[in-house]
Structure formats: structure tokens, C-alpha cells
Amino acid sequence: MSNLPWLTLIVLFPFSASFLIPLLPYKGNKVVRWYTLGICALEFLLITFTFCCQFHLSDPSIQLKEDYNWISFLYFHWNLGVDGLSMGLILLTGFITTLAILAAWPVTRNVRLFYFLMLAMYSGQIGLFASQNILLFFFMWELELIPVYLLLSMWGGKKRLYSSTKFLLYTAGGSIFLLVGSLTMGLYGSNGTSFDLQILTNRSYPIAVETALYFSFLIAYAVKLPILPFHTWLPDTHGEAHYSTCMLLAGILLKMGGYGLIRINMELLPHAHFLFSPLLVTMGAVQIAYASLISFSLPNIKRRIAYSSVSHMGFVIIGISSITDIGTNGAILQMISHGLIGAALFFLAGISYDRTQTLYLDQLGGIAVPMPRLFTMFSFFSLASLALPGMSSFVAEFLIFLGIVTNPYYSLIFKSIILFIGAIGVILTPIYLLSMLRKMFYGFKIYQNSLFFIDLGPREIFISVFILLPILGIGIYPNLVLSLWNEKVESILLQYYG
């Protein structure tokens, strides 16, 4: 069993299964829905089995290695492997994608193509987190682009073509920098050409070259994460995408940028990361406060949640740039936590739109009476997003701030300024989230019509509860997931502290 190519099976299974969708009998959409849900559930079970039976938590090195020579003259290998950092994000991908497929049940137009794209996206996301070859990393990064663009342009709102084109231009522009950086890193050096991440870990560069490489990769990640000022595609995309697509965008796609920042910039380019860290910490703090202010002023629910995502990604930037094990652990935990909370909020925003046919807060009000279950779930996830103690985001944000405080390289004045700016965002978060709840669920704006609204059904309650459980579990017992990547974080930071 241990000799099986587990990771290749995990990466290729959803994509391979998607090609059987056109062969399914044309008996309505039910067959395609259940087939896709079954494939995603089997994939998640395969990931869980691999994690439980083949993966060793105490080993920070790359495990389950697979290396196949794919394109010889390009030194392009199908090179896969996982450690605690990537395994946590792969588990998140499997969990969120399975629930997103279930959330997409109301989709009725071009269902076969829709689910084909969802499965292709599934494979691309897992392939990126499992890649141990920087060209394969780039290939998986680009593989995401096509399904997301089509999902946006075909199943989005009224401005779907504008938002999908904007997403395409931003992401493709960032990908150019990723490709240039990947090729330069692989071709540079006297030890021969190699794109293997494990070999590149031991390769050193002149500081000018390392800085240029770092900046090139940073531009690509700044688009996906996103980092100001490369964030403007995000509100447009989330505002127009179907809520099942939003679950994948907020839950997984944004985490690709944070993962790349740790896996490549922090691990392979430590000297440049040390130089860029004060700037990134400053940008992260400004992003938290700026996005919180913008979110408070927006009347559109999905755009407000989108800007809250930008704000929460600011914490990830600060944690990664704190250059401490506490802060980096907090950043990874924040990625997992936001992946769950962001997916849940967009799901609930989407199903509230299905019932009220509006996303604008000034057109809502009083719907807590006919839809108490929706109100309860929205309240839980809003409290989780504002980092209520006992929720996963509270632990993540606390660790990130503690990481900044314990950094031995930053001055006391710098730490105080960062904490002050970050605190502004922390204070604004409950203001814009609780005001959103008040405007949606209280008052009498549409109370008379709301008597005919249908509350959450069993499928929607199932999705909401299953996302809420890990948020509470991690909040109560953080070591449930911190033990996954703690050893890996310590091994990365040895480069900085020896």
C-alpha cells in the first residue's frame, strides 16, 4: 500500500472523473449532481485516508515523494510531495470543494460543463499544494485560470463578463512574473538546471538576484492573496460569481498566494524575505485598516464580505513577515480559518439572495422573523469572522499579533505603530459585520413580503453546520491543526535564527 502513487491518484482522480460527465445518461440534472458529489466525497475520503495512514506528523520533511520525468529537455518533472503545510491546505481544499458542490445544487444551466469545470479546478488546486517542482507549481497555478474564468463568465451576475475579464487580466499579468521567476531560479547556478524545490532550497544567490526573484514572485502572489493595490479584481469577482464559486475563491484560491509566499519566498529566498519583511508587515497592517474602512461603507453584502477577506488576508501577510514561529503558525492558521469562514459567509449571502433577490442592505430588513435559521447561522459566522474567543480566527489573529511583539529584529516603535494600525482594523471589523446583520435581519423594511420567505432547508443547514464544526473545534483546541505544520515552520525559521 505504501508504494502506491497516492498523490498522483489524489491529483488526477477528479480531473479524470470529469471526462465521464458527458457520458452520463441525459435524465435531468440529478444524475450529474450526484455523480460529481460522489467523486468529490471519494476524493476527500482518499485524502483523509492518505493523511491518517500514510502521513507522519512528527516528520517535517517532504513525504510521499513521487518523481516522474515528464518532459526531459525542459527538466520538467511530475514531482509531488507533501509536508504539514501543504497537507493542511489539501485537506481544506477537499472539505470546501465537496461542500461547494453540494451548495451548487440549484444550478440548472449547462450543468455538465459547470461540474466538469469544478472538478478540473479541484485537481488544479490540490496539484498546486502538492507540487515539488517549480514549473509544475506554475502549471497548476495556470490550470486554475481557465475553469475560474469560465465559471465567472458563464454563471455570474449581470456584470460577469467585466469581472471575469478583469480577473483574467490581473491573474495572467501576475503569472508572467511567476513564470519569469521560476525559469530564472531553475536555470541560475553552476550546479546545472533544476526546478526541484528541494534542490532549490540549498541554492544560494547574490543578494541582487535574490531580491529580483523575490519581487517577481511577490507580484504574482500579491494578485492572488491579494495585497494592496492588486486587490480590485476581488470585490468585482465575488460580487458577480455564483456563491458556490465564491466558496472556492474565498476558501481556497486566495490561499494559493499565501502558500506560495511561504513555500517559495520565505523558504527559498530567506535573505530577500528578511529585507522585504518590514515593508510587508506595514502593507499588511494598512490593508487591514483600509479594507475594513471600505467594507463599512459598502451597501452590497457580497462586496462587503469580499473586502473583509482582503482585510483578513492582511493578517496573513503580517504573520508570514513576522519571521517568528508564533506569527507564521498564526498566518497558516488564519488561512485555514478564513477558508472556512469566508466560504460560509459567501454561501449564506448567496442563499439569502436566492430568497430576497437583492444583495443591497438598504433594500433588506426584518428577515430574521421568517428565516430564523438563516439569521442564526449568519450570526455565528459573522462572530467567527470578527474573531470572537472560542472561534478559530481569534487564535489565529492572537498568534499573529504575538508574533510581531516577539520579533527580535523590529524596534519597539515599529511594533507599536503596526499594532495600533492593526487594532483599528480589529475595532472596525465588528462594526461593519454587526451593522450588516442589523440591516439584513432587523427592522421592518421588507417585513410584509418576508412572510413568504423560506428558511434554510436540510441541505443548507448541513453545509452550514459542517463548516461551523471545525471553526469551533479549532477555536477550542488549536493544536488540532497547529501540530500539522509546527515542525515545518520551525525548520524553515532555522534559516533565519540558526
From Swiss-Prot:
Keywords: Chloroplast, Membrane, NAD, NADP, Plastid, Plastoquinone, Quinone, Thylakoid, Translocase, Transmembrane, Transmembrane helix
Gene Ontology MF terms: NADH dehydrogenase (ubiquinone) activity; ubiquinone binding
Any one of the GO BP annotations: electron transport coupled proton transport
Main location: plastid
Intracellular or extracellular location(s): Plastid, Chloroplast thylakoid membrane
UniProt similarity note: Belongs to the complex I subunit 4 family.
Protein name (database record): NAD(P)H-quinone oxidoreductase chain 4, chloroplastic
Gene: ndhD
